[in-house]
């Protein structure tokens, strides 16, 4: 309740007070000037700086896990260093914006931590895009195993969904609240490399960099100053300090921690997930030596893969052996997928969807594309993890079927490996 009262005073009452003061000053009568003096005295008694400190602390957060007093334990769980407790979102009560900014700051650290694990733990190499980028232009990057271009047998390509996730992640929320295994792509990478796959990890959400807008010099006139009435301009120029003080006061308490205004500078040929996937296909995957390419694509990553197929249908059909989708949001009608493409998907793709049904149970679909089976969970973000074993079994069946010239079939409950065995 106290917080609501403070916000009401700052956002509603004070602007009205300043407006009334301005109107009173324009009238100019002695008694009105006395009212102005009284109002100023009233405002001077309100310790607004202290009020705002209580409302919201500075949006300044540590840039390391240690700074947050968190670390990953031997089970890959994020825990408080002193207490061993899981991450707490509502660190400060009644300060949702501050808590959200704190969570986002931690999320950025998690992203960097996963990048480090991809390079150090999985021994992947970071490759910058575009391949011919100059030193002055923005760049993205992907991760590749050392044999990505030379492995003659098979390659696994991973595509995550949309949002804040980056290369190596399925769901940031899972990494923070549950563990690295369920939320990251690391289990897929390690198992694939152990089984002789080359690996490429796409980074489809790294589409631009943000640069701060250049600030207008303080002495530069505003664009519409020439249209300002002469009387108003003279009054403003007579008392510039008071005008600036009033403007700064209002701006500060209307938006006490105004975030920096930024411009988005898009990365050449990688300005969207679809562009990114097409670029990586043209410059890496299609040129790789692997005879069999296999994809795992989660959520929007499934839509991204279907768009890649639409753009490079013949090439994809020639090189891709199987595609595992996890709760994909693709739509073959909206994306104008051809009949031949839909037929290929029915034979070579399987979509593990969120469902209350047991793992690998067939789920009805209204779209004429690929088989749908249950991922064994109703949580969208968990579908890639819960279907982990089933997907590799599906890949094994697909590769064996290709070698024996028979059609691959999705895993069924009767022959699945239990997830709990992982």
UniProtKB/Swiss-Prot annotation:
The keyword Signal applies. One of its GO terms (cellular component) is nucleus. Keywords: Cytoplasm, mRNA processing, mRNA splicing, Nucleus, Signal. Residues 229-242 have a biased composition (Basic and acidic residues). Residues 1-19 form the signal peptide. Transmembrane segments: none annotated. This is Cotranscriptional regulator ARB2A homolog. May play role in the regulation of alternative splicing. May have hydrolase activity.
